[in-house]
Amino acid sequence: MDVLELLRASANGCYNTLFSDAWFQYVSKQIATTMYWYGALLVIGVLFIAWFLYFKRLARLRLRDEIARSLSAVTSSGGDHRGLRFRKRDKMLFYGRRMLRKMKNVSGQMYSSGKGYKRRAVMRFARRILQLQRENRPLEMKTVEPPAEYLEETIEGSDRVPPDALYMLQSIRIFGHFEKPIFLKLCKHTQLLQLMAGDYLFKITDPDDSVYIVQSGMINVYICNADGSTLSLKTVRKGESVTSLLSFIDVLSGNSSYYKTVTAKAMEKSVVIRLPMQAFEEVFEENPDVMIRVIQVIMIRLQRVLFTALRNYLGLNAELVQNHMRTKGSSVVPNAVGGAVLAQASQASRPVVRAPTSPNSRLSREEHTLSDPDPNPNANALLFAEVHGDAPYIDLYHHQQQQSSAVSVNQAGTRRSSTTYGPSGESPNGNANTAPGTSIDQRLVQSSAVDSLRRELGLSEDDAQIIEPFVEVRELEPNVTLITEGNAEDVCVWFVMTGTLAVYQSNADATRATKQDSKNDVLIHFVHPGEIVGGLAMLTGEASAYTIRARSNSRVAYIRRAAIYQIMRQRPRIVLDLGNGVVRRLSPLVRQCDYALDWIFLESGRAVYRQDESSDSTYIVLSGRMRSVITHPGGKKEIIGEYGKGDLVGIVEMITETSRTTTVMAVRDSELAKLPEGLFNAIKLRYPIVVTRLISFLSHRFLGSMQTRGSNAAGGPVEANPVTHKYSTVALVPITDDVPLTPFTYELYHSLCAIGPVLRLTSEVVRKQLGINIFEAANEYRLTSWLAQQEDRNIITLYQCDSSLSPWTQRCMRQADVVLIVGLGERSHLVGKFEREIDKLAMRTQKELVLLYPETTNAKPANTLSWLNARPWVTKHHHVLCVKRIFTRKSQYRINDLYSRVLLSEPNMHSDFSRLARWLTGNSIGLVLGGGGARGAAHIGMLKAIQEAGIPIDMVGGVSIGALMGALWCSERNITTVTQKAREWSKKMTKWFLQLLDLTYPITSMFSGREFNKTIHDTFGDVSIEDLWIPYFTLTTDITASCHRIHTNGSLWRYVRSSMSLSGYMPPLCDPQDGHLLLDGGYVNNLPGHLWRYCRASMSIAGVFPPFCDYRDGHLLLDGCYTNNVPADVMHNLGAAHIIAIDVGSQDDTDLTNYGDDLSGWWLLYKKWNPFTSPVKVPDLPDIQSRLAYVSCVRQLEEVKNSDYCEYIRPPIDKYKTLAFGSFDEIRDVGYVFGKNYFDNMAKAGRLGRFNQWFNKEPPKRGNHASLNEYTFIDLAQIVCKLPETYALNTADIFSEDEDFDGYISEPTTLNMDRRRIQVPRAGNSLSFSETEMDSDVEIDLELERKVDKATQSTPPTPNKQHALSPTSSQTNLLPLPPNSKPKEKQPSYDKLDREHKRRQKSKQKQQQERSSMQQRDSMVTLHPATMAEATTQTAPHSSEEDELNKPEQQPEQKPVPETEEQQQKQQDQQQQENLTKTDTKN
């Protein structure tokens, strides 16, 4: 509220104001003259009450004395009674009756009549006169300090492991997971090197063939420039290693090199462990799967660490690769006659094409016109001969030009953009040698392509027949795209025979929309004839990192990914040649960076660096989550921020060369890339564009930190996180078994789909994808790599935990950025044992409580404080209103079928699930309502306009009158109810006679605030802020601590009242927590328990109402407008990404009169009363005091207007006064009309999308959804070396949670299955939990009934070649039934299937046989067609045995007698399902 306008209230009463100037002057004068009379009357009243009480007490004493004298007289006249005695029963009866009479007297005081009634009446009157307050403290939130592990790192000793073995184990972890026997073999080859200060560990011309691990001391790695100068690259300390993974590939492929520019020298006495790279060859010969896995890990590190750090953060693109690939083996082919001269001629005739040095300069697309033909075809031929000097050379390009010279222009114009020829030289239409525009023998082309790819893959001439069936040739025209960036389906190994290919990559600074435009792509390099491309995506198993287009008319030979993996099965060492091809393309810069960049694995609780340590490096978070904690001199720890995937940690301290200011530790298992300071300086000197990139990056960071500055939340031991939260992984944990976790996860998944790609994972999903033994320690690498890839592909991954502490639940806790604890709001708040175990597993992970309420309930959330007090580890809570289908008890079958249809619809962005989804992804929308007295009625109109514009509201903050209106919206969420309550409150504020009764002696304020408190308390009741549907905060001015206070919990009405306590009119509110005095928060920030208390505190106008005393600490609270009248910055700090701020405060007049150096009051009086002089504008004393009080508020308001995260709106309500509460409807209509027009204009301008659109996604279509099998983690060792892979058996699938239904888009883990399988019912039971059946979250996976003809039983089925090669035929249920199997008579029931499953688990031998047969079945799909029949024959006998085990016992079927309509309907559904099953069986 505004003090100035309140003092200048209109005297004519046209706006129904409460005060007028004349009345105020009269009252002030009467108080000044009659002050002594009031004092005298008060003294007389007090004396009268004391006299009355004294004489009444005296009368009671006299009556007691008379009774005593009468009793003594009776006793003295009775004679001697010493011989009389009472029986025990009479004594017990006497004392019992006496006790009952006492109890009756005590209990009678509770009623309105009886003894003590008059005394209570007098006390009530005295309490009303003297304003005595009864002690009635509401329930408070317990402020419990977080556990030490939450803010401290884990320090554990490693005494059990020798130091050398420990450092060895940590260092070779970059090569992947090694079993213990393999690790011991590698340790046998280690050597200990003793170095003194100044000794060289290695220098230039030394062989680069070892891994060095520093056991003690310090090693300096530096670069030697051509001019003899040196530049430090990095400092290697205890436990760190010096190696190049690229050199590792060179050594294994037989191309070992020497150190050319890198040297290492000991800075002090050091002990270094040396591990020769040749030691791995012995291990790889015995374990080829280990070799393949190591090469894959190296390629993944190259893509995720080197390219991520250098491209995304330093702006390097084309600088990472060479424009011309180095030849394989050597640059001059020794077997070719005159090879050196030929190479020189090739280099002389080849056009020099310089790749751009950075994404901005660098080379425009006009300089690289893709439609230009190759200027020198002979140069391409020479280059081809240079690479394959000893190969039978065929000048295909030149021969093609000669043969096609006679082709007319019209014929050339009708050419297709590309033509593909298969292994036999035939085009797809089946005609051989019919390529348009050429007469070259395609068989010769095919033979040359096979021979070229054979050499690139390192195969001998005898192995040509292995790759010949898979080599395809394709002719391309200019601008034809072979593969796009991010595509995982068309990954191939491309070999250029003629022409040139151009490789592009999207700009690192491009947004999601601009990345779709190819004009923003950056040219990386060209691929010339004789060069190969595509090996990186082939080895990593991930999507392509580049876009490849034809620059001119070209001919390429390629092998698809599936074919390469089949070739790897027979020749695993081709992975070395593919890796060597990738390494040969890299620039020397990447090799130097490979020595300096480190790939760090951190477990939960481990520190990256500690406070006050030297800052010599920065870190990039590849996966996981980090927490920054500062330790104050007093020992108190405070969270500074948290960092997620893609964030840069420690960059400012490294550049400024200051010590670490905080300690950064891992919240969960994390991967980081370490960028040393020396490497950064070396790149900076060589590529100055990096400095520009870094300045831009730091400028955005500092600008964001300036905009997000704010105060910390009140009352919390850990301050609010200033970093915008954005979670990548979310774990969902049920509190009790009756929590519908699966429907809840589906609903959340549905809402998240509107924001971006999301994935839901369960234990059964992972087992289906990776095998039933995937959670064992030996499969740690596969599991973590697969999960990391899923997290990279999706903006958020949902981990649905089991209801027990299973290995999958423990994995979820290790992977989660945040844990959502899901409970039922109407149930007991007690903490279960399982929930406590979850807290122990993830002590550092942030946990949030989600309380579910049925949509049919009319009650509002209550008792939330009890839930939070019982769980001190919870940092935030959410109230979620759920639709009816969530709480309906259904089988897993029907849940899946239900949500397969629900997920096809558009989610409701206004639902609580969508609000939770936006919070998890960092897209919350905040609404900030400013203060302004009666002008706050415009907030109601703006709320209606916001609702009609389709903008959801996820968080609400308010000051003064905005605190009142915002609290109403958070409590009701219905614009009609909010309008009605706001109108009733405004009408109460116009009743002047009630305000007159509230007048008091004006020492602190003019009014006592009692009636004002009553109006707010009647509006909200005893509601706490924690019980509101929407997260809410209010801001007050704490005059005890001289700062503003943010209230997110506690009494609602009290803090709303304190936020409206305008100075001079109401006393400050005394905070019950600490006793601080709180005023209107608008004094410091005019845009931002029991609910009404904080609303009352936020409306404590100084001078009008007394400050409100906080019931927690006793601080006095005043109106928040004195500090921040529009707290949009506070809302941003609390996590809102997009904010709408509505300002209804008054605007000061800035057009003041310049009166010179001095000012006379008499001159102002003359100007005021003389009608013939021009008026002057000079502020008076109240105006000056008001402007002084709002100095910080005005400054903060200007920052909010200039911020990029806030949409500042000010309705045209300046003509209305602060106390014009009688014009509520008129002001509301003004706000509504203005808001509607404002948002309509935003929609037309395209600026409304950031509030109601986040991700443009087409509505999902049935049967056209993504699948994990289409793009998933590829374990080359598993594929190539045929490692034992365990899959879920047929009977194990019974306990599978998720099945694949047609159109079921929420679980993209398997392919579409036969629809007839869905129609198979359970034997003897329906699909509802209302009947007696197994309580499980899984559905039946039953085999289809098939009848096998006797004539075909003895003949093995012939495999289909196309089916075998199809990538979608990997399911075992799509294979033909083995010949000796028998058809099933009927489907087994749940009980029998359960018994069969347990019997199989007890029989270890049978289980191993089943697993091996399942592996053979799967290998039939991916192996060469020639081995298909043999694998099928091997599988047949065991399948017959398995079917015999699955065959149920013959029992008569018992049908229940229907008693109700519901049971009759279920009976009909069951009968219909059985009829369909019989029909399918006959077919």
Swiss-Prot record:
Subcellular location: Endoplasmic reticulum membrane
Keywords, ordered alphabetically: Developmental protein, Endoplasmic reticulum, Hydrolase, Lipid degradation, Lipid metabolism, Membrane, Neurogenesis, Phosphoprotein, Transmembrane, Transmembrane helix
Span of the annotated motif DGA/G: 1080-1082
Secretion signal span: none
Chain residue ranges for the region called Disordered: 348-380, 404-440, 1349-1483
Active site: S960 (nucleophile), D1080 (proton acceptor)
Binding site for a nucleoside 3',5'-cyclic phosphate 3: 574-701
Lumenal side: 1-34
Topological category with respect to the lipid bilayer: Single-pass type I membrane protein
Stored InterPro entries: Acyl_Trfase/lysoPLipase, cNMP-bd_dom, cNMP-bd_dom_sf, LysoPLipase_patatin_CS, NTE, NTE1_P-loop_dom, PNPLA_dom, RmlC-like_jellyroll
Residue numbers binding a nucleoside 3',5'-cyclic phosphate 1: 174-301
BP-aspect Gene Ontology terms: ensheathment of neurons; glial cell apoptotic process; lipid catabolic process; membrane lipid metabolic process; membrane organization; neuron apoptotic process; phosphatidylcholine metabolic process; photoreceptor cell maintenance
Phosphoserine: modified positions: S418, S424, S1174
Chain sites annotated for binding a nucleoside 3',5'-cyclic phosphate 2: 456-585
UniProt function note: Phospholipase B that deacylates intracellular phosphatidylcholine (PtdCho), generating glycerophosphocholine (GroPtdCho). This deacylation occurs at both sn-2 and sn-1 positions of PtdCho. Its specific chemical modification by certain organophosphorus (OP) compounds leads to distal axonopathy. Plays a role in the signaling mechanism between neurons and glia that regulates glia wrapping during development of the adult brain. Essential for membrane lipid homeostasis and cell survival in both neurons and glia of the adult brain.
Record protein name field: Neuropathy target esterase sws
Native organism: Drosophila virilis (Fruit fly)
